[in-house]
């Protein structure tokens, strides 16, 4: 691979090739990033809902046990 780029100017290696790669694989990169972000968002919502459920159940259990003590 290095033999291919040896005679070329620096801007071909560092500007043109990455730009061409982004143009060719840009849709794939965007879809993968979108999938990962969506998955992380769903995971965050899941954790928040489970945490809220645990909080509500503990709050309810503590209030019902304190009522039975009376």
UniProtKB/Swiss-Prot annotation:
<dbReference type="InterPro" id="IPR020246">
    <property type="entry name" value="Uncharacterised_SCO3924"/>
</dbReference>
<keyword id="KW-1003">Cell membrane</keyword>
<keyword id="KW-1133">Transmembrane helix</keyword>
<dbReference type="Pfam" id="PF17260">
    <property type="entry name" value="DUF5326"/>
</dbReference>
<keyword id="KW-0472">Membrane</keyword>
<keyword id="KW-0812">Transmembrane</keyword>
<feature type="transmembrane region" description="Helical">
    <location>
        <begin position="19"/>
        <end position="39"/>
    </location>
</feature>
<feature type="transmembrane region" description="Helical">
    <location>
        <begin position="40"/>
        <end position="60"/>
    </location>
</feature>
<dbReference type="GO" id="GO:0005886">
    <property type="term" value="C:plasma membrane"/>
</dbReference>
<protein>
    <recommendedName>
        <fullName>Uncharacterized protein SCO3924</fullName>
    </recommendedName>
</protein>
């Amino acid at each position: 691979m290095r033999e291919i780029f040896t005679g070329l100017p620096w801007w071909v290696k560092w500007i043109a090739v990455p730009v061409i790669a982004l143009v060719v694989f840009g849709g794939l990169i965007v879809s993968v990033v979108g999938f990962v972000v969506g998955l992380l968002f769903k995971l965050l919502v899941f954790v928040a809902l489970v945490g809220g459920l645990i909080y509500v159940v503990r709050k309810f259990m503590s209030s019902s046990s304190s009522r039975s003590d009376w």
